[in-house]
Amino acid sequence: MHNTVFRYELNAMTRRTFGFDFENWMQNGFRAEEYIPYSFEEKGRIVANVSVNWMFFNKNGEEQLCFQLGTVMEDKAYRSRGLIWQLMERILERYDGIETGIYLFGNLGALDFYRKLGFRELMQYEYTLKPGVIKREGRHFRPVKKDALALR
């Protein structure tokens, strides 16, 4: 997300869709290399996006590289054109064969869509740390919404 114009457009669409953006996150030194947006744009405006966010998890005492599919959004005027499906297929093809975990937190209305792509529901756990435990260097925890559902 080093392209300032693209970052501005991605943040604008994220604000319209979810009511937040990533600018503070970027300005506070969190690494953009781990956040990879896949987008369709028209006339310089992002109209659909799915992002890959790389992170490490501790699974049974072993560190495992995983990626989260997030910031899944589509401009209302572009819905029902298959843009998100195309982006998801492109991402899954791109990382096919890489030994990693893939997960997302899908909204309940999109579960059938994700199932068609091969995702399945799994048990979800939530862990928290007291403020000040995490330093800016190294790997970071990401917030998890309580009503989210993990798939694939």
Regions found by a protein language model. Name each.
Residues M1-A48, Q68, K135-R152:
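Short amphipathic alpha-helix that is part of the acyltransferase structural core
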Residues E42-E62:
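Acetyl-CoA-dependent GNAT
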Residues M55, V72, N107-A110:
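An acidic- and aromatic-residue-enriched active-site/binding cleft used to recognize and process polar
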Residues E63-K76:
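Conserved acetyl-CoA binding element of GNAT-fold acetyltransferases
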Residues E74, R79-E93:
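Conserved acetyl-CoA-binding loop-helix of GNAT-fold acetyltransferases
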Residues R94-N107:
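Conserved GNAT acetyl-CoA-binding A-motif
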Residues Y114-R115, F119:
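Conserved active-site tyrosine of GNAT-family acetyltransferases
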Residues R120-E137:
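Conserved catalytic-core motifs of GNAT/GCN5-like acyltransferases
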